[in-house]
């Protein structure tokens, strides 16, 4: 068993048949650097096997063994687990800032039951965080709270999986929040005066099953959305505009545009450049954490959620 080290962070992300893992290390107060990264592939869909309430437990042992080979000697105390929106329940809900804490929790549980359709929220593993505070039309303060929930059976299964690793604790994070951590680090390096007047950053995640949208304002995560119907660049742009309209963000308020995910062709995002007047950039986490001892990542855009999840310890 390795000695636990608070300067080390580890994460994994689950998508299709791929389980990606990273380990970050910080030395002498410097920025975290990539220590190891890799992709484990399986002849079955990991989301179906691991992240469904009726998942295939027969595959768990195989994944445990492969993950133990990859991260079995990590000194990280906690493992961050990044999942994509369709693989859990991820939503935002407004709550009045004047509501007592106990009543806030009750409202969150009621909203979660409504969104998920479960008979009892005791069937879920639930996490929540206040993303931002704003005011309603009458000037009353309220909070936008993000909720991430997975079936309790899924959480127990993840506990069995993590049991093969040195970290005994793990936390869930949705991919759209994780990638916003990466953009925050990239933008912290500086920006132009024009970008200061356009404070929003839009990040688009491209996957075979869905498209993700993460929105940040002044480097802080602001809101998120996903669409299963957005398969073409034109449809992705259409849903992006609808998302921004829904949260009241003007199109000319977007100062930077990133894309991440799998099978990326940034040239196919010409409709976004026409709409937002910004050239899309591939969200490459190597710009933040370096290439690592084994050289550049083979698909940097695909690793953005995993690296962003691991960065949680350094925020």
Label each region the model flagged.
Residues 57, 199-203, 269-274:
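ATP/nucleotide-binding catalytic cores
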Residues 56-63, 232-236, 298-305:
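Phosphate/oxyanion-binding active-site loops and adjacent basic polyanion-contact surfaces
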Residues 78-187, 288-289:
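Active-site neighborhood for divalent-cation/phosphate handling
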Residues 254-278:
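Glycine-rich phosphate-binding loops at beta-strand->alpha-helix junctions
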Residues 75-86, 170-171, 251-263:
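Short glycine-rich phosphate-binding loop at a beta-alpha junction
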Residues 179-185, 283-315:
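Glycine-rich phosphate-binding/hydrolytic loop that grips phosphoryl groups
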Residues 1-117, 141, 275-279:
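Non-catalytic, solvent-exposed interaction/assembly segments
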Residues 2-3, 7-40, 75, 137-253:
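Small-residue (GG/TT-enriched) beta-loop-alpha framework at ligand/catalytic clefts
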